[in-house]
């Protein structure tokens, strides 16, 4: 597939197409991925964040990964929805805090690193004016776990 086809797939299909394109780029199957350098960086950081969570299994870890993926999907749209992305990021941090050995700062570092955003943006959503909404989202995350 050409780079242009992958670009169109990402615009339509979001994260799964980006994942596929990034993997093909890493294998050398496509040469130019300048349009998705943001994705390449995001996936690299996401992989680092998952490693930071260790080999812990279970629902909270799966929820952290799912919420980070959700936030990345919101951020990757042609018109990114940062409000929904940050809400998903807050839920990821709250789920991460439930994991053994993890605290808020480590979770903020992992999630912010995976998303390529400043952890203060997520912290502000958790504690600032958007904190009430973030708290509600955290409760919803608790119900899923």
Curated annotation (Swiss-Prot):
GO molecular-function term, one example from the UniProt record: DNA binding
Protein's UniProt keywords contain Kinase: no
Main location per the UniProt record: virion
Cysteines joined through disulfide linkages: 96-107
GO cellular component: virion component
Localization in the cell: Virion
Keywords on record: Disulfide bond, DNA-binding, Virion
Keyword DNA-binding assigned: yes
Subunit relationships: Heterodimer composed of major capsid protein 1 and major capsid protein 2.
Function: Self-assembles to form a helical, filamentous nucleocapsid. Together with capsid protein 2, wraps arounds the DNA and maintains it in an A-form. Capsid proteins probably maintain the DNA in A-form by non-specific desolvation and specific coordination of the DNA phosphate groups by positively charged residues. This certainly protects the viral DNA under conditions such as the extreme desiccation of its host.
Name of the protein this chain belongs to: Major capsid protein 2
Record organism: Pyrobaculum filamentous virus 1
